[in-house]
């Protein structure tokens, strides 16, 4: 039995768009199902953690003693660390989607400057415009 050799390109399964953002070209990759699932999970975790932090903030204001407030503040710091880790994971997903053609530092700087919500808006705008251009 002979072993046949095959070569396959995945480019037809992955959508990318060249986008000029603030004077620099990026190749932006559309999220696949796995990336969408990761993003959805992280956004859900972020919203849950945000709710917990807001609830804890209210409890701290109602604390009866300084010791009680200090304990809650310490718990709050741990939750803030968790919140920041989730934000970092979401940003990492976006950084991976925005290829700056270099070492990724420009992509990271862009994502950090925009924040998650505005990065999502830019991402959506890129693919909305690409879809409109394809129809024309």
Positions of predicted regions on the chain:
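Short, surface-exposed, charged amphipathic helix/loop patches that serve as local interaction elements
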Residues: 3, 14, 24, 31-136
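Short acidic, Pro/Gly- and aromatic-enriched capping/linker segments at domain boundaries
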Residues: 2-20
């Amino acid at each position: 039995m002979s072993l046949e050799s095959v070569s396959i390109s995945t480019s037809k399964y992955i959508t990318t768009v060249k986008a000029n953002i603030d004077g620099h070209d990026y190749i932006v990759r559309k999220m696949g199902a796995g990336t969408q699932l990761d993003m959805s999970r992280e956004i859900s975790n972020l919203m849950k953690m945000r709710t917990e932090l807001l609830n804890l903030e209210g409890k701290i204001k109602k604390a009866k003693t300084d010791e009680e407030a200090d304990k809650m503040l310490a718990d709050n710091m741990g939750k803030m660390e968790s919140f920041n880790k989730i934000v970092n994971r979401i940003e990492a997903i976006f950084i991976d989607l925005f290829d700056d053609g270099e070492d990724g530092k420009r992509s990271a700087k862009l994502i950090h400057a925009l924040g998650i919500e505005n990065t999502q808006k830019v991402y959506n705008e890129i693919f909305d415009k690409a879809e409109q251009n394809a129809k024309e």
